[in-house]
Amino acid sequence: MAAKIRQNDEVIVLTGKDKGKRGKVTQMLPNGKVIVEGVKIITKHEKPVPALGKAGGLVKKEAAIDASNIAIFNPKTNKADRVGFRFEDGKKVRFFKSNNEII
């Protein structure tokens, strides 16, 4: 099955404390979760690793959110959109369902 949302897609968050925020998908995880740039920022406490020259302390980073809580962002309509698949010239392509434009 082809993925409706892929890495580097611009998405919008549908639920949670970050609802309405937009960002690029930086990583797709195998358990149905994604990491979106600038969304769900958490603070991790990291230990120093002198052998690698890493200083410890508080580090802010993005946490994974479920793929069902995001939707692809359509720049033409400035809204969240659904994704469909169709074949064009023998290749399977994704398109926005609202305006049939290829992604």
Curated annotation (Swiss-Prot):
Gene Ontology molecular function: rRNA binding; structural constituent of ribosome
GO cellular component: ribonucleoprotein complex; ribosome
SMART domains in alphabetical order: KOW
Domain of life: Bacteria
This protein's UniProt keywords: Ribonucleoprotein, Ribosomal protein, RNA-binding, rRNA-binding
Pfam families per record: KOW, ribosomal_L24
An annotated GO BP: translation
Annotated SUPFAM superfamilies: Translation proteins SH3-like domain
Described purpose of this protein according to its UniProt entry: One of two assembly initiator proteins, it binds directly to the 5'-end of the 23S rRNA, where it nucleates assembly of the 50S subunit.
Family listed: Belongs to the universal ribosomal protein uL24 family.
Subunit architecture: Part of the 50S ribosomal subunit.
Protein name stated in the entry: Large ribosomal subunit protein uL24
Species, as recorded: Actinobacillus pleuropneumoniae serotype 3 (strain JL03)
Lineage start: Bacteria, Pseudomonadati, Pseudomonadota, Gammaproteobacteria, Pasteurellales
